[in-house]
Amino acid sequence: MLIDITLRITPKMATDAQGNERKAMVGHLGTHFDVMDKDFPLEFTRRRGIVFDVADIGGRDIDIPDIELSKVEGGMFVAFRTGFIESQGYGGKVYFSAHPQLSNALIDALLDRNVSIIGVDFAGIRRGGEHTPADQRCANRGAFVIENLCNLKAVVEAGGACVMHTYPMNFAGMTGLPCRVIAEM
C-alpha cells in the first residue's frame, strides 16, 4: 500500500500562505526541505522509515521519552505525526509561529543515530530564530528536515514502519526544495 504524505497545494492555499510569494520563489511552499548548503543524495530517495505518533503531546517540546528511540536506526527517515497540519490548516500565522517543535535533545539523539531525514507535519523542527540553525545543525550531520507532511495518521494506523520514497525537485539556486514523499507500507 502506498500513502502520499505530501501536502497538496491548491491555488487558495498558495494565495493564503503567510509570505507566500517569497516562500514560493525560494521553494518553501508546501512539503519541502530547506537545502542549507548540501545536495540531496540520490540514495536518500529510498529510506527505511518510521512515523512516531506524538499527537498527544502539547504545551511542551516533543522529547526523547515521547518516542521509542530504540526503533531508530542509522539511515532512517524518522517522521513525527502531531496532527497539527490537520487541526490548524496549512499557511496561517499560528501554523508558522506556534507549531510544535522537537527538543534539542531529541534532535541530537536522532543525529547521534545517523538518521538521513527528519520529517514533521508542521512548519519546522524548531520555531522562530532557532529554525534555520536547527536545520543547519542537521545538514552538518548529514540529515535533511522535511516540513509540512500530511496524512501521517494513515501511516501510523498501518503500523508506522514503512519505506519512505522522497523525490525533491532538481532546482538550483533555491533555499528550499519542494518534494513528493510517499510511504510504502
Language model features with spans:
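Active-/binding-site microenvironments in catalytic and ligand-binding cores
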Residues: 1-185
